[in-house]
Swiss-Prot record:
GO CC entries: Casparian strip; plasma membrane
Membrane topology, record value: Multi-pass membrane protein
Subunit text: Homodimer and heterodimers.
Recorded family membership: Belongs to the Casparian strip membrane proteins (CASP) family.
Protein name (Swiss-Prot/TrEMBL): Casparian strip membrane protein 3
Source organism of the structure: Glycine max (Soybean)
Main location (coarse class): membrane
Cellular compartment(s): Cell membrane
One BP term from GO: cell-cell junction assembly
Length: 195
């Protein structure tokens, strides 16, 4: 004599579907990786911006010969464009240091929109300042290297080689910080997307 026990089908299938829908992981885990990369890029820009300001601010060369009335000297403070460059890159460096706590908040809370929006707005403002100062200094450095035949401006880099090397290095460093700012803005814009 064998006994059979009939077990009715349970409704666990419907319950499992509901649990699966409710237990979905939150999308956008990649935003934390973007926030970490943002912090690392800010550290790189912190190295580039004050490096540019310090290099330009210390650029000075005096030629070894002089006359009774004249001494031939090239210094960053002889050019108002270079003064603008030093002040602007120092401001950019200060902003980058002050933006680090906000970048850390974005790492801790990658889905927070407020700090990321604040950073993208100020990054755009300081990108504009860094681009303006870098481009204007690049124009003066170009004139120092090549001169301008139409205006009878002579190239001074043949005589002031060290000065021109320092100013060129400062311009390159500022343009590195500009590229980093562009990357920061693009990454923040991607992270602000809803998907």
């Amino acid at each position: 004599m064998s006994t059979t026990i009939d077990v009715p089908e349970s409704n666990n299938v419907a319950k499992e579907k509901v649990l699966l829908l409710g237990a979905r992981p939150r999308p956008g885990g990649w935003k934390k990786g973007v926030a970490i990369m943002d912090f690392i890029l800010r550290l790189g820009a912190i190295a580039a911006a004050p490096g540019a300001a310090a290099t330009m601010g210390t650029s000075d060369q005096t030629l070894p010969f002089f006359t009774q009335f004249f001494q031939f000297e090239a210094s960053y403070d002889s050019f108002t464009t270079f003064q603008f460059f030093v002040i602007t890159m120092a401001l950019v460096a200060g902003y980058l240091v002050l933006s680090l706590p906000f970048s850390i908040v974005v790492i801790i809370r990658p889905h927070a929109v407020g700090p990321r929006l604040f950073l993208i707005i100020l990054d755009t403002v300081f990108l504009t300042l860094a681009t303006a100062s870098g481009a204007s200094a690049a124009a003066i450095v170009y004139l120092a290297h090549n001169g301008n035949q139409d205006s009878n401006w002579l190239a001074i880099c043949n005589q002031f080689g060290d000065f021109c090397a320092q100013t060129s290095g400062a311009v390159v460093s500022s343009l590195v910080s500009v590229v980093i700012f562009v990357l920061l803005i693009v990454m923040s814009a991607l992270a602000l997307r809803r998907n």
